[in-house]
Amino acid sequence: MPVEFKLGNSGYTLGVEEELCIVDASTGELVPKIEEIMSRLPEDLAEAVSYELFQSVLEIKTPVCRTVGEAERVLRELRGRVGSWTAACGASLASAGTHPFSRYRDQKVTEHERYRQVIEELRWVATREVIFGQHVHVAVPGPEEAIQAHNRLAEQAPLLLALSANSPYWQGMDTGFESSRVQIFETFPRAGMPPAFPEYAAFEAYVDLMVECGAMDDYTFCWWDVRPHPKLGTIELRVLDSQTHLRHAVALTALTQCIVASSLEDEDAPKGPYHRDIALENKWRASRRGLDAAFFDVDERRNVPARDLARAAVERLRPHAQQLGCEEELLGVLEIVEGGSGSRRQREIYEKSGDFLDVVAFLIEGTRPALAGEPS
């Protein structure tokens, strides 16, 4: 059965989703406050905030935005206003790929049929999924363009992960990884690096087969790091850890948008399926070592430091950023390259104090922009 692709556009409009921790204002623990928060939100925020698998998680999401700058303004307002309503419920918002110490066994599942289905089918695998990601949608003109962008974005997923790595701690321990989140999530079926599709028909055939064999209801149960999203007319990047600082989330959004534009507009852009085996190895290195990793470059047949690749990507993509109006935001990637990802900062704080509460306090403070729309 065809998977109809809603016609997108050639302007690379975008949308961003951020999954955030709901933490107790005094203990720093994850708390199941989503129902209370949702019940208090004013009507104009209702469509911008969503439930997730657990009651200690909420998602904020932008509408379709024409530019990265527009998305930044929306996210700033959402972080501020939703954060204020969360505070009115005795909790705080914190953004990272994992919570440093809260236990997954203590989390309450959200009452929703889809989530009930996920827990019933995946059991222990799903109960451990107390993780938080940033998703970026970029509109593309049609289905074949979606597959071209899919392959090129998948090639760059390891670099994007290294830049976003923000989950060194989990269940009260140092995992030894810069991004432990992706290691946790890859225990899901149909997760991790996606298939290397040669054309849209191959994606449709995959979806048909998985539905026919009873693995899933529809393509939204493909939880890959990158996936076409036909209902929205977009390509969706899902590999990013949630970012503590909004400016880093915005920089990664700009990088994603520019990669998609480059994949469809550059005459010398690679065509066809990406080299999935190499991408899998590079992703492992990104998860383990973040920006200290070196990735294998298939064309040059050598390992290249992640920071060098990031700098080169920014320089190569600047013309697209200028055209899209996000050059300043794209240059924010260099701040991450020089200053380190969120994992580095979390470790610096913990190594100094030995107290995970200080890490959570940093996450809360970093997540909070200038507050707007205080509850009355």
UniProtKB/Swiss-Prot annotation:
This is Putative glutamate--cysteine ligase 2-1. Its EC number is 6.3.2.2. The keyword Ribonucleoprotein does not apply. PANTHER family: GLUTAMATE--CYSTEINE LIGASE 2-RELATED (PTHR36510:SF1). The keyword Nucleotidyltransferase does not apply. GO terms for molecular function: ATP binding; glutamate-cysteine ligase activity. ATP-dependent carboxylate-amine ligase which exhibits weak glutamate--cysteine ligase activity. It catalyses: L-cysteine + L-glutamate + ATP = gamma-L-glutamyl-L-cysteine + ADP + phosphate + H(+). Belongs to the glutamate--cysteine ligase type 2 family. YbdK subfamily. One of its GO terms (biological process) is modified amino acid biosynthetic process. Pfam families: GCS2. Keywords: ATP-binding, Ligase, Nucleotide-binding. It is an enzyme of class 6 (ligase). HAMAP family: Glu_cys_ligase_2. It comes from the Bacteria.
